[in-house]
């Protein structure tokens, strides 16, 4: 599957009070994938918000991905992104079917990426590459890993961790396909700035 562009990831705290307006602003600017990331245990709210996001994604012809919850993804008929401790990738693939997008966190490990491909991943994700507000304690990943993955794994490569419009070009130059961005997109002062940033990220790819 060809996946290339901006991979917008929601943050419920960052988007408090402006959740749908900022997400729609990003979609208006252009988003390849939108990931709903909510680590709380409020299942009813998560279902409601994910359903609202799916409606927006359908309007803008963007693919929705659910973070760490294959059952919610199956309920909505969308894709899922799994961390290394968030359940079995083969089980998620079996649950969601062969057409669904199933992404895998690989941190900084080429071996994890090779295993993810064998297990049926659609794309592999690496990071953090820069200082990250979302995962401040995560170990840094060297830029040259991207080229190694491209040579060995042959799946779309998502990169995450402190990505901004200023540092994103070097990730693209090293071979990244998907720029996974949280604060660098949604940390804007207003919705118009979110749209501007989304357009600018998409222009890099």
Curated annotation (Swiss-Prot):
Disulfide bonds: none annotated. CDD domains: TMP_TenI (cd00564). It catalyses: 2-[(2R,5Z)-2-carboxy-4-methylthiazol-5(2H)-ylidene]ethyl phosphate + 4-amino-2-methyl-5-(diphosphooxymethyl)pyrimidine + 2 H(+) = thiamine phosphate + CO2 + diphosphate; 2-(2-carboxy-4-methylthiazol-5-yl)ethyl phosphate + 4-amino-2-methyl-5-(diphosphooxymethyl)pyrimidine + 2 H(+) = thiamine phosphate + CO2 + diphosphate; 4-methyl-5-(2-phosphooxyethyl)-thiazole + 4-amino-2-methyl-5-(diphosphooxymethyl)pyrimidine + H(+) = thiamine phosphate + diphosphate. Mg(2+) binds at residues 68, 86. GO terms for molecular function: magnesium ion binding; thiamine-phosphate diphosphorylase activity. InterPro entries: Aldolase_TIM (IPR013785), ThiamineP_synth_sf (IPR036206), ThiamineP_synth_TenI (IPR022998), TMP_synthase (IPR034291). It is an enzyme of class 2 (transferase). Pathway: Cofactor biosynthesis; thiamine diphosphate biosynthesis; thiamine phosphate from 4-amino-2-methyl-5-diphosphomethylpyrimidine and 4-methyl-5-(2-phosphoethyl)-thiazole: step 1/1. 2-[(2R,5Z)-2-carboxy-4-methylthiazol-5(2H)-ylidene]ethyl phosphate binds at residues 132-134, 162. GO terms for biological process: thiamine biosynthetic process; thiamine diphosphate biosynthetic process. GO terms for cellular component: cytoplasm. It comes from the Bacteria. Keywords: Magnesium, Metal-binding, Thiamine biosynthesis, Transferase. Its EC number is 2.5.1.3. Binds 1 Mg(2+) ion per subunit. Its cofactor is Mg(2+). 4-amino-2-methyl-5-(diphosphooxymethyl)pyrimidine binds at residues 35-39, 67, 105, 135. Condenses 4-methyl-5-(beta-hydroxyethyl)thiazole monophosphate (THZ-P) and 2-methyl-4-amino-5-hydroxymethyl pyrimidine pyrophosphate (HMP-PP) to form thiamine monophosphate (TMP). NCBIfam families: thiE (TIGR00693). Belongs to the thiamine-phosphate synthase family. This is Thiamine-phosphate synthase. It comes from Pseudomonas savastanoi pv. phaseolicola (strain 1448A / Race 6).
